[in-house]
Structure formats: structure tokens, C-alpha cells
Amino acid sequence: MALYAIFRVRGRVDVRKDIEDTLKLLRVHRKNYLSIMPKTESIEGMIQKAKDYITWGEIDEKTLAELLKKRGRISRRKKLTLEYIKEKGFNSFEELAKALIEGKVTLKELGIKPFFRLRPPSKGYGKKGIKKHFNEGGALGYRGEKINDLILRAI
């Protein structure tokens, strides 16, 4: 089962109520928040509704492991540690990332927060900024595998 990485690019000002509600369901409450969601039909419908505020794509194991290692949280103030992962039966962040992508476990089952607070990406979003689609040189919309580059720059 593939996982989508959904990254909120635009802020909270002048967003229609129905789109704001959809963004909350996707767990991207603020700018530069990222959430990990399964690739299902209902999630894809929500993504299409909020496509003018987010960018998304399929996350790979290496990027997911790095994201969990550096930005994973158990609670608001507690970082995700290797000791916590070992308590849950995984030997490394890479093993956990592989299990998540294969669909064997979920973040909720492990008690890990399903969203990540990131920094703005180094070198920016794109030449044309945050108001244009990715295909036009901007930041919004579907990126596919290139979402991994954006995530690594924002960690």
C-alpha cells in the first residue's frame, strides 16, 4: 500500500470554510505541516478539493525514515526515539518506515503523531512561487516522487 505525503504550502488567510475543513481532515492545519495518509479513493477526493493549498506525492522508505527520525513526535513535547521504537518491536527507523509503507502497521497504532511540523524548504518551493501548479514551475499540486526532495529540504 502506497502512502501519500501531503504538504501544506499556503497559509490560513482567506481560505473557504469547506476547504479549511478538508485541510483539517487531512491533518495539515498550518503552513509547512506534512501528513502521511494512505492512498485511498476518499483521501484522493479530499486532496483534489484542497489542491490549491497543498502539494502531494508518494513518499519513499528513505525519506519516511529520515522524517520519523528527525521530526517524529509521540506527544507534543516528546520526540520519537529509538528506544520507543524498540519497545514497539522495531529495530530501526528504516524497519519502521518499511512496515508503514507496506501497510503492516499505522502511525496511530504505534502512538506516533500522524503529522509533522517542518521548516520552510531551503532553496524555496519553485521559480514561480506558491500560487502556480508544480507543472508550471510553482509549488502546488501533484509531484509524484519529487515530493521526497521537498521533504528532505524542509526537514
Curated annotation (Swiss-Prot):
Superkingdom, taxonomy of origin: Archaea
This protein's GO CC annotations: cytosolic large ribosomal subunit
Single Gene Ontology MF annotation: structural constituent of ribosome
UniProt GO BP: maturation of LSU-rRNA from tricistronic rRNA transcript (SSU-rRNA, 5.8S rRNA, LSU-rRNA); translation
Keyword Ribosomal protein part of the UniProt annotation: yes
NCBIfam families: PRK06049.1, uL30_arch
PANTHER family: 60S RIBOSOMAL PROTEIN L7, LARGE RIBOSOMAL SUBUNIT PROTEIN UL30
Name of the protein: Large ribosomal subunit protein uL30
Gene name of the encoded protein: rpl30
